[in-house]
UniProtKB/Swiss-Prot annotation:
This protein's name: UPF0246 protein Asuc_0575
NCBIfam families: PRK02101.1-1, PRK02101.1-3
The organism's taxonomic lineage, starting at the top: Bacteria, Pseudomonadati, Pseudomonadota, Gammaproteobacteria, Pasteurellales
Family note: Belongs to the UPF0246 family.
Any one biological process term the GO annotation gives: response to hydroperoxide
Amino acid sequence: MLAIISPAKTLDYQSAVPKLAVTQPLLTDYSQQLIDVCRQLTPAEIGSLMSVSDKLAGLNAARFADWQKEHNEQNARAAIYAFRGDVYTGLDADSLTAEDIQFAQSHLRMLSGLYGLLRPLDLMQPYRLEMSTKLATAKGKDLYQFWGEIITESLQNALDEQGDDVLINLASDEYYKVVKPSKLQARIVKPVFLDHKNGKYKVISFYAKKARGLMSRYLITQRINRIEQLKHFNLGGYQFDDSVSTEREWVFKRDISE
């Protein structure tokens, strides 16, 4: 079983991290191609492309300039400890044990606009490049065209290594769009998290993001290796609702204070 999650815009390269054996990202040849394209852009062009402030555009231009294909613990850190944000608040990697992280290394992948697909212990340098960015390359008009085949093949390879065919989609729609389901020999299940508010159940973005992280954590800490076990997920107060779930979409509901 393999779960995929989105990355985060917020990064942390200051706090202490556990001393674990890190790994090299697997797709840096492609990352280098994107870096080469981004280095040709001015800060103003980066700001326009990414819809960010002049300050952030300058920071990203500097990061593209500083990026090195060789990753080490001086210029990078393990991806699972670098990402911060709602999903990663739910995941709470800092409280996971070394054994948990090793399980995650085989069962969790992070989609990335620059790195394509990251394992938890893969080294990652600071960057910002969202998957929806319309960055034109020799492969097409945007990152979906650049990464689609590559990421899908990488996911298939990871599933083949496990001898399993179940993919849990815990990524946002923006990031999952890069995956080509028709080219995966896999059963894909998308958990949907609904909160009861103002008289009805609906997806509330902040809560849904955190819930994706919570389910990732549950999968890791409970050593989930069979899809049916995920129906017992109850972190954060969510409960599986069989009556509204389908084979492809599993619905988890929660009542929150009005």
